[in-house]
Every structure is written in structure tokens, then in C-alpha cells.
Regions:
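Nucleotide-activated donor-binding/catalytic signature segment of Leloir-type glycosyltransferases, i.e.
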Residues: 3, 8-34
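CheY-like receiver
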Residues: 33, 98-101, 129, 133
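A charged, aromatic-enriched C-terminal amphipathic alpha-helix characteristic of glycosyltransferases
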Residues: 107-137, 142-143
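Short, hydrophobic beta-strand segments that form beta-sheet elements in well-ordered domains
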Residues: 1-6, 68-71
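Conserved acidic donor-binding segment of nucleotide-sugar-dependent glycosyltransferases
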Residues: 85-93, 100-106
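Non-catalytic N-terminal targeting/anchoring module and adjacent flexible stem/linker
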Residues: 131-168
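Nucleotide-sugar-dependent
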Residues: 26-33, 40-63, 69-81
Length: 168
């Protein structure tokens, strides 16, 4: 396991001969570790501290071509789990079954599906959509200002005309 142990007592972690807690690693080292994985695991504890996390590891592992198994963290389940991109498991038996399923997936079709999904959710695409929304709001505001200014002129002209008609 790579990464810090936080919000859980290290003594509560499972201890087995094939489980190694390596702590945090420099980002430059991570691809070397990832290259040796058959399946990427996201075994987050499910508690109030993890209820609203959105692990960036999920798209990173998917982009690296690894099948992923995660506990049912809300931002992993939706969209990755519901989209069939990540296997979701919460019990030891579910994790074993999910890992076996991940190992038996057709790698080529999984990668095609993942690539298509990630292309729709890239930072460039997200920023482009945000910029469009901002521009739409600004354009609406400009149109509204023009309309209000035009209405103001119309009201002023009507007031002037009314003064002439009524003699006020």
C-alpha cells in the first residue's frame, strides 16, 4: 500500500505477509510501482471523514490502464462504478470477487471504454465548458443591461411626452 495512513489507527490495518505499507512516495516514483500492479485498489475506510472525498487516484489509475477496485466512496461509485469503469466492493469477499472480475476483463475493450470516458472529463474539456458557461452568463448580463438601458430611455421619453400632454 502506497500513501499515508490517515484517519485510521495503523494498528487497525490488516497484517498479512503479502501486504506491505510503504508510506508516501514521491510522484516521480509512482509510475514504477504502478507498472507492476495487476489491479489498482482504493480501499478507503467508509466513515464521515471519507464520505465526501473525491480521490484523484481513480482517473489516474484508469488512465494508466489499470483495472480499479474501490470501496463505495460516493465520488467513485458515481460516475466510475455506475459507468462500469471501476469495480465497487465493501467486504473482504466482495473485494476478492471484484479483483477476480477485474483480472478477467477484456483489457482492450476496458481501455477503449476508459479512454472514451476520460476524454469527456479532461481538465481541458472541463475548463472549456466552464468558459462557455461564464461567457453565457456575461452575454445574458450584457443583453439585460442593454434592455434595461433601452427601457429606461423609453420610460424617460414617455415621461417627457406625458409632461407635454398633461402640462405637468
Amino acid at each position: 500500500m502506497i500513501g499515508p495512513v490517515v484517519k485510521i489507527d495503523p494498528d487497525d490495518l490488516p497484517r498479512r505477509a503479502n501486504i506491505h505499507y510503504l508510506g508516501g512516495k514521491d510522484y516521480k516514483e509512482l509510475p514504477s510501482y504502478l507498472a507492476g500492479w495487476d489491479v489498482a485498489l482504493l480501499p478507503f475506510a467508509r466513515n464521515e471523514s471519507t464520505r465526501f472525498i473525491s480521490p484523484t487516484k481513480t482517473p489516474e489509475y484508469l488512465a494508466a490502464g489499470c483495472p480499479v477496485v474501490s470501496t463505495s466512496i460516493q465520488d467513485v461509485v458515481r460516475p466510475y462504478g455506475k459507468g462500469g469503469l471501476v469495480h465497487i466492493a465493501d467486504t473482504p469477499a466482495e473485494f476478492v470477487a471484484a479483483i477476480e472480475a477485474a483480472l478477467n476483463e477484456d483489457e482492450e475493450s476496458r481501455i477503449v471504454q476508459v479512454d472514451a470516458f476520460l476524454a469527456q472529463t479532461s481538465w481541458d474539456r472541463t475548463w472549456g465548458r466552464m468558459a462557455e458557461l461564464i461567457e453565457d452568463v456575461l452575454e445574458t448580463k450584457r443583453d439585460s443591461s442593454r434592455l434595461m438601458a433601452a427601457q429606461g430611455r423609453a420610460v424617460s421619453a414617455a415621461n417627457v411626452a406625458s409632461c407635454f400632454v398633461t402640462g405637468d
